Regions:
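Glycan-recognition surfaces in beta-rich domains, encompassing non-catalytic CBMs
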Residues: 505, 579, 816, 841-993
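Carbohydrate-binding surface patches
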Residues: 471-537, 579, 911-913, 920-922, ...
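Ser/Thr-rich, Pro/Gly/Ala-heavy low-complexity intrinsically disordered linkers and tails
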Residues: 1-115
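N-terminal catalytic cores of secreted or lumenal carbohydrate-active enzymes
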Residues: 113-272, 281-289
Length: 993
């Protein structure tokens, strides 16, 4: 077992690929407290509940620790330059983190001389705008749940509540929560980028159901960790019945009240407009007036008062907001709108209107959809820029700084902050936290979260109250600057200064965050005047950067370095290393356990291989996965105050109820697939819930018919089957169909059936087709016998159940209907791994008894899957994994369909890649043109002097090696000619006997 934050014990070191052994699961089995340990009662300790509205400490100075008023702690008043790490190794558990001296006491920075010309940062208490309670208050960061990005999150809650609680605690818990808002982009069951979110009302007559939309439940659970959390909603596309603004108001109101009545919280902010569209300012003012005056349909005066107090946000446009000038000139609009938010771009309009709105009119300005990190930062240093570079955590940090400096953004919401959908979906690897394997409990916490801690942990973030008594810190414009170029992305590789200062409104404390996303060290002179403290308090220095070679990847994350003292003139000298972030603060945090506890380290990614129930991992039978959609007796935990588990709730009730509940492990890419209990029946089915003849269709980002995926991307050879039936008694000219697919990995066409390599489609009249990449390669009708297959007595009625099956073994694909083989297809360019898909037209369609089984004599799955940049694992000390020789480029920020957005590309002949593993084969995956010729060496012997490669798409195989004994092997491939692109390396498990 891998302890949270710890190194691996027997069974293998933790790594991104992960072994299949179930003992490789991360976690201690209990819930995680704020110090990283398991609480004996299974509860989550969060360090106390934040004061209402504050999102953090409510003390006057907002400090977690006390204020220092004297000189330096330790030996004298020396200044800090190029501060070394103290000897004695890292503290905390396993993989590092925490301060090098254990975090117990302060140490003085060693004396040093400044190098180069320092940049002066003046912090004048007169510039801390305590009277500005909205525009300059630092509100921290937010989670956007939208577009199917939370599709698997409730499975973590049901299957691994300890890991779900850990996730909530990391994001929303502690004395200084990172995330202060959950923003929910309401769905309409159609693809809005990654996938759809379920509509809360599919018909105007339907009672709003928020339990089937995971964002609402996420917000409810997050509030048990931070009751001050804000929640907002907006839409991109609406259900088919929503045609007018009155319909919008009805949909929103019913949904808002459903959330309040189901979970006990009122929505705080609403954007009445359309996501990433120009605002309708007339409707905005009308909506604001309606919501304030509405007195109908409430269950209590409290409910009405809370509803009437909802605030309005506009406009969530992509790029600079178009409405700044109107907000300045139109007092009616200005009084109607509390928040101006727009996406990604860090800049203001040409007149500086958003800066004026914040400073002169005290309006909140948000980056209401911001870019997080692209990649797994643990493996990023191979590219040569540490934790910085293209789409890195440091780049994200500079985006925060530039967003405030240029347009006074004081809140940043990440889309998505949580990536809880299968890899290969649109906008994959764009998140701060990845939770894609609910059966294993695997979660990757990226170093981007540590960057956010450098801001949120050294201030009191949140929303100030009207009485201005909560002590929320202000951002100090005159003490913040960046020379980083660009708007999205932002680049600080030019080595120019970049910093942001946060300060307590009572002027007793401040923190300055320095971001250095460059190869050049930077030196700063801090000078503080007109502050409310006495003397010249030392500044604690906290740093994050990549590890030195041979050290645990996170050994330099959130490290307390030392206390720097002011010189006789009151000046502090601070040096910021290349590719690092450093926070200098008057707060005393060094002795606080929370600050010396690293993020949890991901454990092994156990392959999905269950018993016949689908609920329990088991490698002792022929079943890889099964689901009859009953879930009888299954419950999920209920979280109470402080994240404590206070009870349980029926599985289906918690996820939407009998007429539409979130199934286990499915990830929709179009349409709405839910567990459904037909009237008069006791048999639950999986039903595609969007029927265009009954409800029409709303708008969409990526058009396509309903399709959902389930399973593990590492599955290789298997037979998948499912029962299907229809509710519409017309074939609808071939559009009313049911289908099963195999070996789906995602990609640009994944929102349609053409993105599934192999798919069997059936009409109820017996017409079938085997599709490869969306094109028919075989077909016929089992009633007439066309196509070569006849099934005697086949019942060609719409409501009869039939069984669809696909067997995929190496390059062969065999289609089955009711157990009869229809055809076998051999693919010259086989796709060898991937999940199972279920698909239909936009008509009510039923599925049941899904089963995925192993195939005798064939390997069922990869035993390990590594990112191309995974040259070491995550243990302490790290163990060597992939070994590159010769000349390669290792690039980050690649295509969204590349695994973790990284690629390694050979530059010249002679480039080599070597890996030692246990298994029967090795594959290289990634987008290739098939030009590479490889010399293959196994255990020191050349086994193929000139192996060919295949042209391949993202997620699929360009080179395969099979037939090895199930033992330890060292395989090397050397490029003889052409170009080899490596996205992933996978090892093959033993065949099923």
């Amino acid at each position: 077992m891998v302890a949270s934050g710890g190194m691996a014990t027997a069974g293998g070191a933790p790594g991104n690929g992960g072994a299949i052994a179930k003992a490789g699961a991360s976690g201690t089995g209990g819930a995680i407290n704020s110090s990283g340990g398991a609480s004996p009662d299974g509860s989550i300790a969060t360090g106390g509940v934040a004061a209402a509205g504050a999102g953090g400490s409510s003390s006057g100075d907002g400090a977690t620790g006390g204020l220092r008023t004297g000189g330096a702690t330790g030996s004298g008043g020396s200044t800090a330059i190029d501060v070394p790490i103290a000897k004695g190794g890292t503290s905390g558990t396993g993989g590092g983190g925490g301060s090098p001296n254990g975090g117990a006491t302060s140490i003085a920075c060693p004396a040093g001389a400044a190098t180069g010309t320092p940049t002066t940062v003046s912090i004048d208490g007169a510039n801390i705008k305590a009277a500005n309670i909205n525009g300059l208050t630092f509100k921290g960061f937010g989670v956007l749940s939208a577009n199917g990005t939370s599709a698997l999150l409730m499975d973590y809650k049901s299957q691994h509540p300890d890991k779900y609680a850990e996730l909530l605690n990391v994001l929303f818990g502690g004395s200084h929560p990172l995330m202060t808002q959950v923003k929910i982009e309401m769905g309409n069951d159609r693809n809005n980028s990654t996938g759809p979110d379920p509509a809360t009302m599919r018909l105007s007559t339907e009672v709003a159901n928020v339990k089937r939309a995971p964002g609402f439940q996420l917000a409810a659970d997050a509030k048990t960790f931070n009751p001050s959390l804000k929640v907002s909603i907006l839409r991109w596309n609406a259900p088919g019945w929503v045609k007018t603004n009155d319909d919008v108001y009805t949909w929103y109101k019913n949904t808002i009240l459903a959330a309040y009545r189901s979970y006990g919280y009122m929505i705080d902010f609403v954007n009445p407009g359309v996501n990433e569209s120009a605002p309708d300012l007339t409707w905005t003012t009308q909506y604001a007036a309606r919501i304030k005056a509405d007195a109908a349909g409430f269950n209590s005066t409290t409910e009405q008062a809370l509803y009437n107090g909802i605030k309005v946000v506009i406009s969530d446009e992509v790029g600079i907001g178009s409405f700044g000038a109107t907000m300045i000139s139109d007092s009616t609009l200005r009084s109607s709108v509390s928040v101006a938010g727009y996406h990604y771009n860090t800049d203001d309009d040409s007149a500086g209107d958003f800066t004026k709105l914040a400073e002169q009119f005290d309006k909140e300005i948000w980056n209401s959809e911001a870019q997080a990190t692209f990649s797994n930062t643990a493996f990023r240093p191979i590219s040569g820029s540490g934790i910085g570079g293209t789409n890195s955590p440091l780049e994200m940090g500079n985006t925060i700084i530039k967003g405030f400096v240029n347009s006074h953004r004081t809140h940043f919401i990440y889309q998505p902050a949580i990536g809880s959908f299968y890899e290969g979906g649109q906008y994959s690897s764009k998140e701060l936290l990845s939770a894609r394997d609910p059966w294993s409990g695997w979660i990757h916490y990226d170093a981007g979260l540590v960057i956010l801690r450098h801001f949120a942990w050294f201030a009191t973030a949140g929303w100030e109250n009207q009485a201005n008594t909560l002590g929320v810190w202000r951002v100090v414009a005159q003490s913040s600057y960046t020379g980083a170029t660009g708007t999205n992305p932002v680049s600080g590789r030019n080595g120019t200064p970049s910093y942001m200062t946060l300060a307590a409104p009572d002027k007793r404390n401040f923190s300055t965050i320095f971001m250095n996303d460059s190869a050049t060290a930077q030196t700063y002179k801090l000078q503080a005047t007109n502050m409310a403290y006495t003397g010249k308090p030392p500044l604690e220095l906290w740093e994050t950067r990549a590890a030195e070679s041979g050290k645990a990847f996170n050994s330099n994350y959130m490290q307390y370095l030392c206390d720097v003292s002011a010189d006789a003139s009151g000046t502090y000298i601070v040096s910021v290393k290349p590719w690092s972030v450093l926070t200098a603060t008057t707060l005393v945090n060094v002795g606080i356990a929370e600050y010396n506890t690293p993020l949890p380290i991901e454990g092994g990614r156990t392959v999905l291989d269950t018993d016949a129930t689908g609920a329990n991992q088991s490698t002792s039978d022929k079943v890889l996965y099964a689901d009859d959609f009953e879930y009888s007796g299954t419950t999920v935990p209920v979280f109470g105050v402080g994240g404590r588990i206070t009870g349980s709730e029926d599985f289906l009730t918690s996820r939407g109820g009998l007429q539409g509940a979130i199934p286990r492990y499915t990830c929709d890419r179009n349409g709405g697939f839910e567990v459904y209990l037909p009237s008069g029946s006791t048999n639950h089915v999986l039903r595609q819930q969007v029927d265009q003849s009954a409800m029409g269709l709303g708008g969409t980002w990526n058009s396509g018919n309903p399709i959902t995926g389930v399973g593990d991307r590492r599955w290789l050879n298997y037979k998948a089957s499912v029962d299907v039936s229809f509710e519409n008694n017309s074939t609808q000219s071939g559009n009313n169909y049911a289908a099963i697919g195999a070996r789906q990995q995602g990609g640009a066409n994944s929102h349609t059936t053409s993105g599934t390599p192999y798919l069997l489609r059936l009409l109820f009249d017996g017409t079938w087709a085997l599709l490869v990449d969306g094109a028919s390669v075989a077909g016929g009708n089992v009633v007439s016998g066309t196509g070569g297959a006849t099934i005697a007595g086949f019942k060609a009625t719409y409501d009869t159940w039939h069984n669809l099956g696909l067997a995929v073994v190496d390059s062969k694909v065999t289609a089955y209907l009711d157990g009869t083989a229809l055809t076998t297809y051999t693919d010259a360019s086989p796709r060898l791994s991937g999940r199972v898909d279920l698909a239909s037209g936009y008509y009510y369609t039923r599925f049941d008894n899904l089963k995925v089984e192993t195939v005798d004599g064939s390997a069922p799955y990869y035993s390990e899957f590594l990112d191309d940049q995974e040259t070491t694992d995550l243990a302490s000390p790290p163990v060597t994994k992939l070994v590159y020789g010769g000349t390669w480029s290792h690039a980050n920020g690649q295509d969204m369909y590349d695994y973790q957005r990284t690629l390694s590309k050979s530059s010249t002949a002679g480039a080599s890649l070597k890996y030692t593993f246990t298994g029967t084969g090795l594959d290289i995956l990634g987008p290739n043109d098939g030009s590479a010729k490889l010399e293959v060496t196994v255990d020191g012997q050349v086994t193929n002097a000139s192996a060919s490669t295949l042209a391949s798409k993202e997620g699929y195989q360009t080179f395969t090696l099979r037939g090895l004994s199930n033992a330890s092997h060292t395989v090397q491939v050397k490029v003889l000619g052409g170009t080899l692109v490596v996205d992933g390396v996978a090892t093959v498990a033993a065949p099923i006997q």
